[in-house]
């Protein structure tokens, strides 16, 4: 549900799309790969993100898990067992990449934010391998090859406790943005 703080709030996603359009962005693609074993489009629907994005005027919504036009990218100096990752060509060819995570607690990482949200650009096999290795190091390795132009962090209702799926939403009431995701 949209108020569970499991996903970025639909309102923040819609606001980012509207602001990008106002700033003169051309084609805006909302792209996501949901958690392992989950149907990305069903998750976007049940979270309210799909409708909010469409209402805000997004040009396309893509499920990265079903993308077949992938480019194998080597990680130059990996700190984890991840030495390469397959990324969607459209993502690598985009003029800009805007990362829009929600801030929440995470049992495997203490908290989840900009770096952890980058897992939304890889397919299930990479999700799985990252969880089988040092997850924090794998996220840093992915961050070396996927560099968002802008990160907008939803801290309106972040999650505390047993996240990323079973925590408790808390009212915080702000959005934080910057060019350096770390």
Explain the meaning of each model-derived region.
Residues 1-182:
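N-terminal and secondary-structure boundary signal
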